[in-house]
Amino acid sequence: LSAENSKSEVYALNEQGNLQATDDLEELILRGKEIYQETDGLFDDTIYPVMKLWGFPTGNYHVPTAAEVQKKLALVDGNKVEIQTRDSDEKGRDSKEKANFVTLGADQQIDFGGIAKGYTGQKLAELFQEYGVSSALVSLGGNIQAIGTKPDGSSWKVGIRDPKGGQQDYIGVLSVESQAVVTSGGYERYFEEDGETYIHIINPRTGYPADGDLLSVTIV
């Protein structure tokens, strides 16, 4: 699901512009399109060309010109991502006989960095439970997935990092059972140039890092 891993499905889709998709990729694309609609375009997984322009995927940071931003921003449009699912087979063939086919708009590229960890956490929780695991805590960076409770029946404790502090500085601790805790903020990935700080959370309407008062957001 990584846009940077040359062996991933997403990488192949970005290179080719279309792809016969697995169920995982299909589910992510459909969910991404739902969130795109729900947020009126503030979440848009076709933002990848703009992310690359700023250098966030590679670490080769660069403050682009306004013209460069506008050129890449013209490619960002979640409505142009099309997917033909098994259910849309006009001939009514059995689902096993028809694969899903994904097509991007011209020169578009996608990045599931905003939802892939949460999706992976959910799938891991489902897999563990299928194998009888009733107590576990899955950590995927800023995404924590709790399965059940601790073996002693008590709640899991998940620390929320202080965005103004270090790695071990916390602003609070949450008690969770069979829940996911997701935290994101610009304090983890950013660069500075000419006295300005540029975070990795890009506004798909402007092509520039999001500018606001929120340092960190946690969703349970």
Where are these regions (language model features)?
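Mature catalytic core of soluble alpha/beta enzymes
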Residues: 1-220
